[in-house]
Swiss-Prot record:
Protein name, per record: Putative UDP-sugar transporter DDB_G0278631
TM region(s), chain numbering: 117-137, 183-203, 211-231, 234-254, 264-284, 302-322, 354-374
Gene Ontology CC terms: Golgi apparatus; membrane
Lineage start: Eukaryota, Amoebozoa, Evosea, Eumycetozoa, Dictyostelia
GO terms under biological process: transmembrane transport
Biological source species: Dictyostelium discoideum
Length: 382
């Protein structure tokens, strides 16, 4: 290639293109400069990449910390829930495993035995108050018709009912603390005998011979089982027998006044008239002060069972009043013993507070046969 006077030629290995020496404004890059620029760019990219990686790592760490915090918070919430639910489920399992579940007033007795809560009158007082409040609410919304006007004749008629109810409940709870479940169930079937006698003298009612025979079979079974009970407890037997008398009186009174009063009226009056008795017993036993200083007062499980026992008390009383009004005191008594058949069998097999004896088992079987026979006779007579 021929060079002109004003041209400068630089070898291609040191320059990328040809320029005119007067064109000073033209920027050119040598291979060295390009290498430097490339190195700088690479360095810049490396720095940018490092910064991005660092930022990305920081963000990841920050997100990880946040996630860890959130996970820890969630774990704390879940663990707290699990601890609470497991505690409640554990109590539920223990409750259903408890022999007291198999008897009447299970929740009430569970509260008293598991938490060593001895203020039974205070608990019954709350049951009465809740019953009154519920009935007033139902009346206010015209769901039920309840006569809340007290008259002297009504008070005189129902006062024995309320007295027998309170005494029966208290004696039943105390006797359950002294006896095992099969023996308690067997002896409570003697209520049917007391009712047969009271129906004859008070209601002027004579039961058919087969009904009487089935009741006699139940009594024989109870006596046989009681004689061979190696864990004999004289106090427990005395309390449960007294409880039978007051329970029979209570059911007889319900039937006697049922013709002139609805089930809801009887339930309302019984609750109101029971209040003075329970208040008096609470004051005498200093149960209000006891409740205020009770060690499990703020235990959520105790609170749940306490409230549950109150509302179940209302439901149980309504069922007893209704069944007795529609049927008879004897039927209510025997029907209430049907679940005691399962109580007797399961209690004898599962729980270790029973001393097994062959004759004792025979007595329980005879007792159960009498209960089934009575139920069959009542069903076929309808």
């Amino acid at each position: 290639m021929k060079l002109k006077p004003n041209d400068i030629y630089i070898p291609l290995n040191s320059i990328q293109f040809k320029i005119h020496h007067n064109d000073i404004n033209i920027k050119y890059d040598t291979e060295e400069d390009n290498n430097n620029n490339n190195n700088n760019n690479n360095n810049n990219r490396y720095i940018d990449d490092n910064e991005k990686m660092k930022i990305s790592e920081d963000e990841s760490i920050f997100k990880s910390i946040n996630n860890d915090n959130k996970n820890q918070q969630n774990d704390n919430i879940i663990n707290s829930f699990n601890r609470g639910s497991n505690s409640f489920l554990f109590n539920i399992i223990n409750f259903y495993k408890s022999p007291r579940f198999l008897s009447g007033g299970a929740v009430l007795l569970y509260v008293m035995t598991t938490y060593d809560f001895s203020a039974s009158n205070f608990l019954l007082f709350n049951q009465m108050v809740v019953t009154i409040v519920i009935l007033h609410i139902l009346k206010h919304f015209n769901i039920l018709k309840i006569n809340t006007n007290f008259e002297k004749e009504t008070i005189k008629k129902l006062m024995p009912l309320s007295f027998c109810y309170i005494i029966n409940v208290l004696l039943g709870l105390d006797s359950l603390k002294q006896l095992n479940i099969p023996m308690y169930s067997a002896l409570k079937r003697l209520v049917a005998v007391v009712i047969l006698v009271m129906e004859y003298f008070i209601l002027k009612k004579v039961s058919p011979p087969k009904i009487i025979a089935s009741v006699v079979v139940m009594v024989i079974g109870a006596v046989v089982a009681g004689i061979t009970d190696l864990s004999f407890n004289s106090l427990g037997y005395s309390l449960v027998l007294l409880s039978c008398i007051f329970q029979a009186s209570y059911l007889i009174y319900v039937k006697k006044v049922a013709s002139n009063m609805s089930t809801y009226d009887m339930l309302y009056y019984n609750s109101v008239l029971s209040l003075p008795i329970t208040i008096f017993l609470m004051i005498v036993n200093q149960e209000i002060e006891y409740f205020q200083t009770f060690e499990h007062l703020y235990d959520s499980s105790f609170q749940a069972y306490f409230i549950l026992s109150i509302f179940l008390g209302f439901f149980l009383n309504f069922c007893i009043f209704f069944c007795t009004s529609v049927n008879s005191p004897l039927t209510t008594s025997v029907t209430g013993q049907v679940k005691n058949i399962a109580s007797t069998i399961i209690g004898a097999m599962v729980f270790n507070d029973i001393i097994i004896h062959p004759i004792n088992i025979l007595g329980l079987i005879i007792n159960i046969i009498g209960s089934i026979w009575y139920s069959f006779l009542k069903l076929t007579s309808k």
